[in-house]
Structure formats: structure tokens, C-alpha cells
């Protein structure tokens, strides 16, 4: 069983927004189903978590937006001429833009520099979110969704991408590599993709890095396309469980 700990409300929100962004990106390209999309982030149980931690109203609204995708899909059964695919695509684009613009707010600037998924809590003065993955497979899938969200975010940072990308590699990818220890070939391959992303210092290096990150996002999305939906059910304890305190379940 794999376990992660995220400390502090801002870091918890930052993580949830990244997972929400990654889920939206994978769903937009039809590489995960609506059911998987909802179980990853856009579910009433996530509202319970947000309320429990008294997280931001904006994050709450983003989750409700994602839950609204089901209404668009259902409308296709009721209205013969309803162009539900165009409406759905626009709704997902809107959702992604909300996630990205929220992540760019000043309150999350410190998260870009300091965020880590592998905290060791040493104080009760801040909130902690404990995440238990029942299998290495579920850990692998959620990490891929998180990395997909982070990759999309880095691309949108444009000229400010380089420093944020270096921090992402230092604070997150290095720790993930140590935890994975080659156990998952899929994660190892993804980490190699990030390692080979060129961040030289010539005048086109920033643009070249963004293009490489776009290629990585395509590879990450493609991974989910090859999975069976039954292997990505996060509405049960077969996948992951969130805790407010160790061994105290608040969401699964």
C-alpha cells in the first residue's frame, strides 16, 4: 500500500486542482470515460472533502462544473438535434481554464516552489490530507493524472515555464523516482520523458521546452487510452482513500 501526505490548505487545494486539470485533459480527448472522470475528482464525495477542510469556494465550484458534464451527455438522449459533443468540448475547455487560472493566482505561487506530495507531517498546526493507495497500480494512475495536469499547467505558463519546471523536477519527480525504484515500467518511462526535456539556455530553449512538454502530455494521455475502465474505478477502496487523520476515512 502506498501512502502520501499533503500538508497545508493551499497545498491540498493545489493538488486537487492539478488532479482535476489532469482528469479534464484526459477526458477531453476521450482517453478516459465519463465515469472515470467523475470518480477521479468530480463527485459529491469531493464536495464532502472540500467542506471538511473548509477549502476554497472556487475549488468547490470547479467540482460542480465537472459534475455538470453528465447533464450534457444525458441531454443527447432527450434532444435529437442537440450538438452535445460541441457543448461538452466547450464545457471541458472552460473547466480547464478555470483550473489553470486558479492555479496561477498569487496564493499558489509558493506551492509552485515548495509543493511536495511526500511530506512528513511534524506539526498539528496545519491541516494534513492523507492519501492511501490500495495498490501500486492505483498509485501509478493517479500520479499519471497529476503529472498530466502539471504538464498542461507548465505549458500555459509560457515564458515563466523554465523555473517552474526545474522546481517540479526537483521537488516531485526526484522523490517519485526514489519511491518507484523501477517498480513500475510505465512510471519509469514517463520520468525518462521529463528527464530528456531540453531546458538549455539559448534564446529558443523556452519554446522548445514547451513543445516537448506538449509531446509529453500526448504520451501521458495515450497511456489512459490503453487501460480498461474497470482498472480505473476510484469510487471504491479498490483505488484510493482520503483521510483527515491516519486511519480516519473521510472520502473514498
Task: Locate each region found by the language model.
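Acidic, Ser/Pro/Thr-rich low-complexity regulatory regions
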Residues: 1-252
Amino acid at each position: 500500500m502506498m501512502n502520501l501526505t499533503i500538508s497545508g490548505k493551499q497545498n491540498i487545494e493545489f493538488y486537487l486542482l492539478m488532479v482535476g486539470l489532469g482528469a479534464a485533459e484526459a477526458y477531453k480527448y476521450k482517453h478516459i470515460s465519463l465515469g472515470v472522470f467523475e470518480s477521479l475528482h468530480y463527485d459529491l464525495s469531493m464536495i464532502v472533502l472540500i467542506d471538511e477542510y473548509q477549502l476554497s469556494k472556487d475549488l468547490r465550484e470547479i467540482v460542480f462544473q465537472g459534475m455538470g458534464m453528465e447533464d450534457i451527455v444525458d441531454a443527447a438522449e432527450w434532444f435529437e438535434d442537440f450538438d452535445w459533443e460541441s457543448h461538452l468540448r466547450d464545457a471541458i475547455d472552460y473547466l480547464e481554464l478555470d483550473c489553470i487560472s486558479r492555479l496561477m493566482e498569487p496564493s499558489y505561487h509558493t506551492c509552485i516552489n515548495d509543493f511536495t506530495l511526500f511530506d512528513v507531517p511534524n506539526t498539528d498546526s496545519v491541516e494534513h490530507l492523507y492519501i492511501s493507495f490500495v495498490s501500486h497500480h492505483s498509485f501509478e494512475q493517479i500520479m499519471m493524472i497529476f503529472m498530466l495536469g502539471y504538464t498542461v499547467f507548465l505549458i500555459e505558463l509560457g515564458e515563466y515555464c523554465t523555473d517552474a519546471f526545474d522546481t517540479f523536477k526537483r521537488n516531485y519527480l526526484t522523490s517519485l523516482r526514489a519511491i518507484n525504484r523501477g517498480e513500475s515500467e510505465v512510471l519509469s518511462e514517463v520520468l525518462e520523458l521529463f528527464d530528456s526535456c531540453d531546458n538549455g539556455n539559448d534564446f529558443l530553449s523556452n519554446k522548445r521546452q514547451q513543445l516537448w512538454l506538449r509531446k509529453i502530455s500526448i504520451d501521458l494521455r495515450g497511456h489512459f487510452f490503453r487501460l480498461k475502465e474497470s482498472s480505473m474505478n476510484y469510487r471504491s477502496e479498490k483505488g484510493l482513500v482520503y483521510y483527515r487523520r491516519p486511519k480516519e476515512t473521510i472520502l473514498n
